[in-house]
Amino acid sequence: MANVLIVYGSTTGNTAWVAETVGRDIAEAGHSVEIRDAGQVEAEGLCEGRDLVLFGCSTWGDDEIELQDDFIHLYESLEATGAGKGRAACFGCGDSSYTYFCGAVDAIEERLSGLGADIVADSLKIDGDPRTMRDDVSAWAGRVVTAL
């Protein structure tokens, strides 16, 4: 049984829904899952004792990449603390009409890769309401479980 942490930042509830759905799918596969809001965690020690950390963040801003407010402190702290060096994968919700569709997901994954994280699955990028893409969310969770 693997120990998985899912950390997310969500303003409208869409990314939170994805975090909860992915967490439920991973737990149903027999793994231990903890889901935390990014505003309630610190980067220091984030990956310690975890087999995998999933990072979920919605993207805001049309002309530049803006991470969801609760996620900014964690994102900025990852490099300073050296956290984020374990196994990871990223997901998020956005709007494909924006210049940088799900740009926060790309920024987080790039930061983690730069810190030496092992990215175990391609990122999941949801356009709009994730509830209409339940099969895609579950398929991604399945790929994550396979990587465990």
From Swiss-Prot:
Q: Which UniProt keywords apply?
A: Electron transport, Flavoprotein, FMN, Transport
**Could you tell me which residue ranges the Flavodoxin-like domain spans?**
4-145
The cofactor(s) it depends on are: FMN
Q: From which domain of life does this come?
A: Bacteria
Keyword Chloroplast recorded: no
The region annotated as signal peptide is none
Q: Which GO terms describe its molecular function?
A: electron transfer activity; FMN binding
Disulphide bond pairs: none
Record family assignment:
Belongs to the flavodoxin family.
Q: What does this protein do?
A: Low-potential electron donor to a number of redox enzymes.
Q: What is this protein called?
A: Flavodoxin
